[in-house]
Every structure is written in structure tokens, then in C-alpha cells.
Amino acid sequence: MIKSNHALKRKELFSKYKQNHNIFFETGTHHGFSVQIALDLEFDKVISVEIEQDYFLECFDKFIPYISQGKVHLFYGDSNAWMDRMLKLVEEPSLFWLDGHPDGISGDPLWEELESIKNHPIKNHTIIVDDIPVYFNSKEVEDKILEINPNYQFIYEDALNEGNLVDVYKNYDLVAYIP
């Protein structure tokens, strides 16, 4: 039940901010729930990277028809090792879902991911950062995003908590957008 509620909540979030975006860009593929949601929402191109080999292989098998069509682009490894190559596939404003915090591994790639987006020539993507404030200081994340474009505005969307996070944190996703 939690997974279906979580998937519904995520689909509502992506649908709300899809606007005219045709490209969905994700760090942290996990089981491919967001990739499937992006396909269901009819994004023309879905780009995702996963650091865990088992999850990557699961998703590669699951989405092979879309990979063959060039609609889904999956990468295996650390997002920061692939960001520049992945961003070459982005030729228009896109919806970014930054959820690349690996299970059981210290550190988080968010700062480097945002730096790569900052160096990309397009400066008006919609960026959603998962799990604020579980992993980050929201003001620091906002400041980093404003380095990309000082016109970004921010909204905090209520996220459906899973597992033990429900008892510890009120969990939010940070949405940065250009009005």
C-alpha cells in the first residue's frame, strides 16, 4: 500500500510540474518507478542513472523495449561520473528529479549534480530535489540552485514518507522552477 500511495504521490508531483517539458532527467533509478511514471506521463525522452548494479540490471531488463526505441537512456554508476554525458542528451528545458542518494553509502552527489546543471547551457529547467530536509539544509540547496539562475522560485511539496522516516522527519521535496 505504501508503494502504491508513494507512486501515486510521485506521479501527481511529476504531472504538476511537467508543463511543456518533454525530457525527464533522474538521478537514482532504484526500481524504475519514476522512469515508469515518466513514460506514463508521455515524456518523449527519459534519462536516468543508478549506482547500484542490481537495480540497474533490473531496470535495464524492465525498460529494454524503450531503450531500443531511444526513448529511455539508462546509465550505470555514480551520477557525477555520468552527468556531463547525460546532459548532452538534454537539448531543451527539462524536468529534473534529483534522488541520487545511494543506500548505505556515505555522501551525496547532489552538490556536484547541481554544479553540472549550472554548467549546462540551458538555465530554466524545473528541478525537484527529493527528501528535503532528511539529507540537506534547504537554504543551502536553494542558494546552490540560485547559482544556476537567480530567477528560480521555490515550493516545498509534501512528500509521502516511507519506512522509519515517517517517525523522525516531516519530509518535503524541493521544487525549483522559473515562472
Protein language model features and the residues they cover:
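A short alpha-helical cap/connector motif
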Residues: M1-L95, H101-P179
